[in-house]
């Protein structure tokens, strides 16, 4: 979904998106559009006075809920996942029953394969069981390489914490059943 705070902006953004990406993708698959509106919130929620920033990924997914009729993936447009990641996601979503409590999936990567020599990156640092069950994701907004490996800071660089290169990280490639939408509306 595309974000807009004014109805007239929706059409400008829609046309720009279609021209840059949508028309090309539409040659290979069916394309539908949903637009993230700041004011469109689940019952019981309100926009705080002065807020102009979009709500985030979950709100964007909820903006598309009327277009979702089965399992679906959520990706960031600014990351490249590679074809294998989409194959893994498809295999999972096409073989799992919807409705299992929190039976969702995420494609993770080894941290060492996702860092840049040209500056910092933001990643979701994952805590998993040995069997791969995800327990938590903590966003680290400034992860950098240095001569001894990889580390992150949360205080503007005053202190750093090392991260092993084999740490699983999220680049926001998630898979859900349609039932996730009900859960998302409650939160």
What would you call each of these model-derived segments?
Residues 83-171:
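Conserved core of the sugar-phosphate nucleotidyltransferase
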Residues 81-82, 176:
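Hydrophobic/aromatic residue at the end of a short beta strand that borders the catalytic acidic motif
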């Amino acid at each position: 979904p595309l974000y807009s705070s004014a109805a007239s902006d929706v059409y400008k953004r829609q046309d720009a998106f279609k021209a840059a990406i949508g028309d090309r993708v539409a040659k290979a698959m069916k394309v539908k559009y949903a637009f993230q509106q700041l004011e469109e919130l689940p019952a019981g929620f309100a926009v705080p006075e002065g807020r102009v920033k979009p709500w985030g990924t979950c709100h964007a997914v909820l903006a598309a809920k009327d277009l979702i009729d089965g399992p679906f993936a959520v990706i960031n447009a600014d990351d490249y996942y590679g074809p294998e990641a989409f194959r893994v996601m498809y295999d999972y979503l096409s073989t799992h029953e919807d409705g299992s409590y929190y039976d969702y999936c995420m494609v993770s990567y080894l941290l060492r394969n996702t860092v840049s020599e040209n500056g910092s990156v933001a990643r979701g640092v994952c805590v998993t069981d040995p069997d791969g069950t995800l327990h938590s994701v903590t966003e680290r907004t400034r992860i950098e390489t240095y001569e001894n490996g990889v580390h992150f800071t949360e205080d503007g660089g005053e202190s750093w914490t090392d991260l092993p290169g084999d740490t699983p990280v999220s680049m926001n490639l998630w898979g859900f059943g349609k039932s996730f939408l009900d859960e998302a509306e409650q939160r």
